[in-house]
Structure formats: C-alpha cells, structure tokens
Amino acid sequence: VVFPDGIGVLPWMLCGTNSIGEATAKKMEEFRLVIWGMHGIYGAGKTMDETFGLIETVEKAAQIYMLTAHLPRKNTIKDEDMVKLVELFGVKYRKDFLDL
C-alpha cells in the first residue's frame, strides 16, 4: 500500500557512469524509488522528509523480508483482499503487479 506504483530495480552497474544515471532516469519515469543492485537506493518525493520516509520504509521492509524469508509463508494477504484494501483507502495501484 505504501508503494502502489512499485519500485524500480536495476542490476549491478558501474557506479559514477552515464549509463547508471540514464538507466535510473528511465526507471524514474515510472517509479519514485529505484534500487541499484549492490549499491543502494535512489528516491524522489515532494519534500526531503517524504523522500527519506519512502527510503526508510523500503529499508525496513527489506529487513523484515530478510529476517522472515526462510520461514513458511502463513497468513499472507491474497491479491483479491489487497485490492479491497487499496480501494478502501483510495490508493491507485498497478493491476499488472497482481495475479487476478
């Protein structure tokens, strides 16, 4: 629900080059956040506070995932229920991210 437009992901690229900058700019046309493989994350928001909030939320989600990835999946939210949740809160979401 926090990232209804998703998060862009780039594979490892040589840092400090035009190619990683151009690839990031292309992803930013579609996403507010781009994860750079083996580097870090790039984000954009309306304010610096919003941007840091987005990045910190991704970091926390990644921590939770890494701590629980080895556990059996229980009580996951079904895609149909996720649609109900985002519609309840009026969040625009990408239908192509769900298996409906």
Region roles according to the model:
Residues 1-100:
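Glycine-rich flexible loops
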